[in-house]
């Protein structure tokens, strides 16, 4: 994981403070393919599964911490019973963000999304479309074409 000390903050027009890159990216993007970052299973902690090269398993879990670093396949959720409240705020049980940051709400990112590539790369906040890992077989898919908007917002 990239330490928040190695990043810069970007302030949006609403005053929200964002980390300057995709979570897990080693650098700020200078193209649409050089700073994808990690691929997280929704609401799962940063336990190693987010690495693009982590192993995989089909065993789902009933707990909030699987206790291994494998990407969980075979279901649309890594938990036996879905729990979509584990990333809530900087103190969220499974918050994958560096200290002081959190995953923003949908409302916070709605006005931030830029769909024009030229405009996106002239802005201060550059977030390439990282793709995703297929939940059936863990293979990488749609790099540069698709990206879930898992951005980091600083709590203030």
Map each language-model feature to its residues:
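Conserved positions within compact, well-structured domain cores
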Residues: 1-156
């Amino acid at each position: 994981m990239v330490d928040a000390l190695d990043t810069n903050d970007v302030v949006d027009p609403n005053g929200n403070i964002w980390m300057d890159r995709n979570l897990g990216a080693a650098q700020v993007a200078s193209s649409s393919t050089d700073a994808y970052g990690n691929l997280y299973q929704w609401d799962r902690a940063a336990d190693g599964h987010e690495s693009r090269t982590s192993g995989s398993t089909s065993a789902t879990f009933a707990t909030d911490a699987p206790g291994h670093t494998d990407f969980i396949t075979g279901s649309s959720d890594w938990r036996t019973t879905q729990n979509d409240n584990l990333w809530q705020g900087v103190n969220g049980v499974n918050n994958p963000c560096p200290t002081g940051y959190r995953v923003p709400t949908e409302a916070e990112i709605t006005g931030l999304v830029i769909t024009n590539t030229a405009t996106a790369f002239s802005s201060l906040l550059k977030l390439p479309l990282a793709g995703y890992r297929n939940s059936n077989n863990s293979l990488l898919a749609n790099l540069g074409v698709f990206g879930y908007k898992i951005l980091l917002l600083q709590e203030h």
